Amino acid sequence: MCVGIRLIISVTFLLLVVSVRLQAQDTKVSHPFMWKSFNNPAYSGFDGLAGVNIGMQRSYWSKPLDFRSYFVSADYAFQEKRTFGLGGLSLFYQRDQESSVMYVTQLFAAALSARVKLSRSTVLQVGLQPSLYCKSVDPSKLTLGDQFDPFYGQILDISPELMSFYADKVTIFDMAAGIYGQTDFNVAWHGVASLEYGFSVYHIIESTQSFLSEHGSASSEENLLNRRYSGYVSYAHPFALGNQINTVLSPYVMVDVQSVMRNLQFGVCWEEERFGLIGLGVRGDQFEGLQVGTLLVHLGVNIPGGRDSGWKIGYTCEVPTHQGTMYQNTSHSLSLHWYYRIVPKRCIQRFDN
């Protein structure tokens, strides 16, 4: 009896998690080297780097579940002159998949930003990002009858009809927009601090108008992407330690609102310009009455190349703070970044020494 009750509770909870994963919330890129560009179209070209980025994010749950995300992007930052106010151009590819039933979502997107320099120390960029989403389920991965699937819960005998419905391959055209800015100001000991801030909106287009599906409006309503609002604020304070060791301490706050899902993440990163960064963060996820906490640890390594080229390697580990719940998953993300050109910073240099 006790086992049956636990099974019912597990099925109910996992179905709740599925509804969050597949309908209510987008996959988040967790590493500082990538989260700005994948979370705000206006950040395209803002850091002045032209290069290529690849990454993978994998989640391990309390039940046997393998949820993976793959990220690829290319960034190009325009020079200050003869660009008609353009900031940068970025291309994105993202693939989310749950391997036990092969639920796949693919994203193809391009972001273009325009720059407005309000003063010597303040610059703003606005950006647009048209996107294509492709969603599908592999029906051969589903087993009918009394199967307890780790992602979908219990698969019932009525699944043939549901399987033919969800196996529909859906293609979505969507649009995102954002604004990103930075204000620099002088502080003591010949350094420059900066305040960065951004706001973005994803899934602007009405979903029932953006889907191209064999099953028409019914499939569109079932597979809708809820509008997502994201905000980001960070403060970077320079610390020159001598011997040309320049470090920056950056506390940050990120907020995401998507349908009934709320995310609040805050933390701090300590970066050395030549070597890399280390960071620590805490994220709270809220879905109606459900609240989940996650601890994030960030590591980054800079590998200099030529004069204006080099490599970056990023790693993030996410560990749940609420152990013992069904919603516990440890995620690992690894990313590699290669840049071949550095455009001069939009504002003044951070260190004078």
PLM feature spans:
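Cleavable N-terminal export/targeting peptides
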Residues: 1-26, 341-353
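Subset of outer-membrane beta-barrel
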Residues: 25-353
